[in-house]
Amino acid sequence: MAVTWNDGAALTKWLKHYSSAQDILIVGDGDFSFSLALATAFGSGANLVATSLDSYADLNIKYSDATSNVTKLEAMGATVLHGVDVKDMNLHANLQLRWFDRIVFNFPHAGSHKELVRSIFATARHMLRRHGEIHVTHKTKHPYSMWGIEQLASQSSLAMVEQAAFQIQDYPGYNQKRGSSWRCDQDFAIGDCCTFKFCLEWWASDDDRFF
């Protein structure tokens, strides 16, 4: 459920860890339903940049709701980018001069995606604002518990801020997709999972970091 706060200047709307006052980059969003859940809660997508590795043509082949979700996001003012590779996204023409308060990567669930997590830490750290955070939502049962996400993050000078339980019902309309094979448009059971939050090591102990 979205929560609205009046900070005296403008209304700030929150959905769990995310607010309309933050500049948010969502990476690898499948059918873009997570980004749409945020934009809907905020009443605007102006603070969102939603990305996918897929081209627009491939996106529409893989996901039945992709066209609709992208259209809604763009109508709400979100920036939607296709063909964005996490390995060099900080050099992307539309991203290289952008800095974010939150960078979000949900469910890198396939085994090969462990290296993608390593890559996102390595590139996203260069795209964070002061006190910004990288959020990776990930399954926590074996074999995913063996990935050592905190260790992967530390290789990019990132420190864990918090490990928060993830409940998909907190994000109405979000449909987690397999993303590969002939079942790419099917949801998958997420089971036990958490959102792991990281910041640059030198901000980890700064009392003014949270907002």
Where are these regions (language model features)?
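Conserved beta-strand signature within the Rossmann-like core of class I S-adenosyl-L-methionine
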Residues: N47, I120, R130-H138
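Class I S-adenosyl-L-methionine
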Residues: T140-F211
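A short glycine-rich, Lys/Arg-flanked "PGG" loop and its adjoining helix->strand segment in the class I
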Residues: H113-R130
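A short beta-strand-loop structural module common to alpha/beta enzyme folds
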Residues: N47-L59
